[in-house]
């Protein structure tokens, strides 16, 4: 009999590694014969329409739920509306997820971020197994969830964390249970070889969203110290406006040359050549999807040990 798995999405978009990774996992599970459902917060933005289309093409059933705030009260994202509206929204979301579980005879609920709790509660109410996939260190903007550890422990049949330092951290947070680890799931097909560049121009490249946690400003400072004549530093990916401004200000203040930002690309790896070196200087990140993709594409890669 076909098993049905319900995933709870953090954002319902394809602009972050956690979502891309688990979309790849959901597609894989569909190919293995599972029935896969997905619930996401529906904010009626174009990027979510693209998300739905991508999932539906893969045979994944999607449910967009209206939400005042989807993440925990204390999680990043501010405090939209007021406390009363947020509590009512949380309650409605839990009820809606319970209905989805019952109507579809769901066998397993998986929350794809520590930042959402609705699926955990709904699964408990309906006596269905619940797994938690955690991508975030309990530090900085996600430090709030240290206060949620008892809840997470109580409402998880199993806890999975991104392999490496995060798994080690969570083993200390949950000393009485096993923490399983996973590497980000990728659908990339390893290439015979990256694009060959006819000249000898070398570049340092960094793929991924420009954010404080990913720490690209530190790479810009290192590039300045290296002072390599003729070498370019290229960033491929969208950005947080405030952090991009910090980077722009530093570049202008120090009159740095040969630094460029190419923005979001559907296939950033198609822009990489055999003369490039990939560098990922994250200060507070897990073992990310871009690391896996970089290695699978045969790119020499340097990444921070954080």
Residue ranges of predicted features:
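A conserved mid-protein helix/loop that constitutes part of the nucleotide-sugar donor-binding site
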Residues: 16-24, 202, 211-225, 245
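Short glycine/serine-rich donor-binding loops of glycosyltransferases
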Residues: 288-291
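A structural motif in glycosyltransferase catalytic domains
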Residues: 22, 29, 204, 219-222, ...
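A conserved, positively charged/aromatic
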Residues: 131-157
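Aromatic "clamp/platform" in nucleotide-sugar-dependent glycosyltransferases that forms part
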Residues: 264, 283
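Glycosyltransferase donor-sugar binding loop
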Residues: 39-46, 207, 232-245, 261
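Short hydrophobic beta-strand element within catalytic cores of glycosyltransferases
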Residues: 300-304
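Donor nucleotide-sugar binding/catalytic pocket of nucleotide-sugar-dependent glycosyltransferases
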Residues: 63, 154-191
